[in-house]
């Protein structure tokens, strides 16, 4: 998968090359990542990329010409079918389903805005989709681009150490992930749940599903409201709720 980023600060992405899932995907050649700085496309000697907004108001707005020229070069280099994504609070909110939809593209070009944003006409003329990573404001779109690139890299075959890791992540099946444990078996009185030591794979699968359902019920009930649970899931969730309420019932 090919990625490109239009950014004033390409150095922010250096950490992606050196570590984690994205670094592994880059080294394996599963993804490519290129950058275009709008300042390199400015026509004046000061390499100006912003100007005061029409109508007044605080801050500066990124102008069309340097961004548009950078997008044209990026599109050409990333190849046919490249989609241009502008990262902004007004965009579609990112979730796992959104990542899976974006993963169907061969190449994506992210436009990372700064200041008060970009001239609206650039969005109308050049942008295919707007995306947001949440209802809050960042200093620019670079961190949002990194979030999306990381999420997409995880979905590519062969990138994660274990093939099933991505399928067990939170949100993949519309639920939060179950708890995980490793050595030691006991620490300061806190024990690993016995079922995980039993070797009974059917019981382990059932426990993990129950915990995922219960954790979602406790922490993100909105996710459950969007799902239709099958009979097993209904029984496991009811069992979790009974156990939880019994454990947390206040003494009379």
Curated annotation (Swiss-Prot):
The keyword Zinc does not apply. GO terms for cellular component: cytosol. Its EC number is 2.1.1.228. S-adenosyl-L-methionine binds at residues 113, 133-138. The keyword Methyltransferase applies. Keywords: Cytoplasm, Methyltransferase, S-adenosyl-L-methionine, Transferase, tRNA processing. It is an enzyme of class 2 (transferase). Pfam families: tRNA_m1G_MT (PF01746). GO terms for biological process: tRNA N1-guanine methylation. It comes from the Bacteria. It is found in: Cytoplasm. HAMAP family: TrmD (MF_00605). Belongs to the RNA methyltransferase TrmD family. Specifically methylates guanosine-37 in various tRNAs. This is tRNA (guanine-N(1)-)-methyltransferase.
């Amino acid at each position: 998968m090919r990625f490109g980023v239009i950014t004033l600060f390409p150095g922010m992405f250096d950490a992606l090359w050196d570590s984690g899932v994205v670094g592994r995907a880059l080294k394996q050649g599963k993804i490519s990542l290129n950058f275009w700085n709008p300042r390199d496309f400015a026509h004046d000697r000061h390499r100006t990329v912003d100007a005061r907004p029409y109508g007044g108001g605080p801050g500066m707005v990124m102008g069309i010409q340097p961004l548009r020229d950078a997008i044209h070069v990026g599109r050409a280099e990333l190849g046919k079918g490249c989609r241009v994504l502008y990262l902004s609070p007004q965009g579609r909110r990112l979730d796992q389903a959104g990542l899976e939809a974006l993963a169907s593209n061969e190449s994506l070009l992210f436009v990372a805005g700064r200041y008060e944003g970009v001239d609206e006409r650039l969005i109308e003329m050049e942008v295919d989709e707007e995306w947001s990573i949440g209802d809050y404001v960042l200093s620019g779109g670079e961190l949002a681009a990194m979030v999306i690139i990381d999420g997409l890299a995880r979905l590519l075959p062969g990138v994660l150490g274990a093939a099933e890791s991505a399928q067990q992540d939170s949100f993949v099946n519309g639920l939060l992930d179950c708890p995980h444990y490793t050595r030691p078996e006991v620490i300061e009185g806190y024990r690993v749940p016995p079922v995980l030591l039993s070797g009974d794979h059917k019981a382990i699968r059932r426990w993990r599903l129950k915990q995922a359902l219960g954790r979602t019920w406790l922490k993100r009930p909105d996710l459950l409201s969007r799902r239709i649970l099958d009979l097993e899931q209904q029984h496991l969730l009811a069992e979790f709720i009974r156990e939880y309420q019994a454990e947390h019932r206040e003494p009379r």
